Amino acid sequence: MKRIFALTLSLLLIFALTACGGEKSDNSSLIEPGDDATLSEILEYDFQLRASQGETALTALAEGLLDNDAINFDGVTMPVEPGLLMGFGNAEITGFDQGVQFGPLISTTPFIGYLFHLDGSVDDDAFMEKLEANADLRWNICTAADEMAASEKSDIVLFVMAPLHAGE
């Protein structure tokens, strides 16, 4: 009887130890484009993949992008409304009904990203052209981003101003 009890107890212990290990998300380490890809290219790919898998909640999308292995800073997200937005000077950005800004917790990294859900009043391409025409890569006084990128999937627009590679 003691052997059966000991065997049962050890099996329960093994089961408890192995059952507590959670699965890691497959999407948190997406760096598919290649070793020489820029940070913007990596995030565009990640965005397209997540959006094509049905992720439409902007905050969840932004947090997923910040979890990408290519990002080497602690990031934060915050909702934005149509109007004046950081990185676009005095241009009022309209044409969306939901928006999320994401970027580093400490702004010494020249990175800022936005996700916009378009409201249907503007064409996707025209909205992205307006963003690119008004974006200022030196929005942050001490640093400047190297590139900007815009991408669209299912009425959601990603816009990023970033260094070529994380850590620069």
Role assignments for model-derived ranges:
Residues 15-19:
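C-terminal motif of bacterial Sec signal peptides marking the signal peptidase cleavage site
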Residues 21-168:
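Mature, Sec-exported extracytoplasmic domains of Gram-positive
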Residues 1-4, 8-11:
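Positively charged n-region of N-terminal signal peptides that target proteins for export
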